[in-house]
Amino acid sequence: MEAGSINVLITGTNRGLGLEMVRLMVEGSIPVKKLIACCRDPDGPRAEALQTLGEQHPDIISIVPLDISDICSIKECAQRVGALVGSEGLNLLVNNAGIINRSPLLESSCEDMRTLFNTNILGPMNMIKEFLPLLRTAAESSKISGMSIRKAAVVSISSLLGSVQNVTKTYENFSAVPYRVSKCALNMLTTCAATEFRKDEILFSLLHPGWVRTDMGGNNGLIDAPESVQKMFDLMASMTEKHNGSFLDYQGQTIAW
């Protein structure tokens, strides 16, 4: 591996933040050797921009199908990624894929909750479990002391809406109960992982990208995807063991749980 370059996997890369992460990463925002870009249907029309990036950077980008709501798909992806990265392991896993439901409590069904949890919490949980061996391989083979994304890290994209302390400030304009509850659970999952795998020197952190103008965020967002992603990349690059278990916004401000 070239000095300073890392092996990265990003989920949900066919559009929005995930696609912008791939675009900026291959442009050098984070030095990368292998970039595994995952999405549910990489051959479909919604992934044309991703396919174009893959064709432009065939030595760096590997596009791998992944449905994070399907454990079999996650296991198959882990096998393929293991073959791609080999003995170097995986330095950075970005749990970006997610779905949204804007319903208030009285309009939220049990099925709504199950659907959001299956993708937004069980997906990241299974990604951590199945890719842990590759993350451990990267951590164990690294000569870097302490924690960083250049060693081994999992960064999950969360949301201010998952903050319990901020509900009264944000609920009136955006109830989204199933989404809020799933992101709150993701925050707890990440904090547990940060504690459990501290001994392995694998960094776990949560980032809120801001209200971004994407398909999910809508046109009324306050920030464009390139700016959000670049600032998140800058944060990722500066992370150390003191950020293990942290919950930050894209500007580096700590978000209350």
Predicted ranges, named:
Residues 199, 206-209, 214, 218-257:
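C-terminal helical subdomain
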Residues 11, 88-98, 120, 155-158, ...:
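Rossmann-fold scaffold of SDR-type NAD(P)-dependent oxidoreductases
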Residues 53-72:
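Rossmann-fold cofactor-recognition segment
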